[in-house]
Amino acid sequence: FIALVYPLVEAGVLGNDALLSCYSLTGYSGGGKKMIAEYKSEDKSPLLFAPRQYGLTQQHKHLKEMKGITGIENAPIFCPVVDDFYSGMQVTVPLFAEQISCSSSEIADIYRAKYQGPVVTFCDKSDNGGFLCAGALSGTDGMKISVYGNDERILLTAVYDNLGKGASGAALENLNLVMGKDKAFGLDI
C-alpha cells in the first residue's frame, strides 16, 4: 500500500484527503507460528482450503502506518485475505480516474522513475496471461509494482513475498548502507 500510494501523494497527483480502499492476498506464513501449524496440520479444517478475509473490524495493525507514512488523512478501507499457500503477497489499490489528477500511463511514469530496482522495480505488466499471482516472488526479497485497468478504473498493484526481507533483511540493507555497499548486497532479489 505504502509503495503504491506514497509516490502519488508525493507527486501531488493523489490528494492526501483521498478516500482509498486496498485489498491484499497473502500466504499463511505471515500469520505466524500458530497459523502455519493450522495450515500444515494433518487435521486441517476444511475452512482453511479457501481464502479467508480478516481485519473485519477495520482495526488492522498496519492501518496506522499505511495512513501515517503515506500522509493521507483517512485510513483506507483495508481488506486483507489469507489463503492456502505458504508465502507471497499481492496488494491492490483500486482507483476511479476521478480520484487522481493524471492518467494511468502518467502513474506508470511516476512509478517507473521511482522504482528502478534492484529491490523494488516497476513492471509494465507482471501478470501471467491476465492473472496476477500472489506467489510470483515467493522466496525473494524483491517487489514488482504495476498499473492495470483502463481510462475509468485503475488498479495499482504490488507483488512481493510477505516474508520477504523481514527484519533481518532490513537490518542487512541498513548495514550495507552504513558500510557503503549496494543496499541489495546479500539479499535474494
Specify the residue positions occupied by each region the protein language model found.
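Short acidic/polar capping segments at secondary-structure boundaries
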Residues: 6-7, 26-29, 161
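A glycine-rich, Thr/Ser-enriched phosphate-binding loop motif common to dinucleotide/cofactor-binding enzymes
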Residues: 1-3, 54-61, 163-172
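C-terminal substrate-binding/catalytic lobe of Rossmann-fold NAD(P)-dependent oxidoreductases
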Residues: 16-19, 23-156
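Alpha-helical scaffold segments in soluble metabolic enzymes
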Residues: 3-7, 65-69, 170, 177
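NAD(P)-dependent Rossmann-like dehydrogenase/reductase catalytic/cofactor-binding core
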Residues: 142-189
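Short, hydrophobic alpha-helical segments
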Residues: 12, 70, 97, 174-182
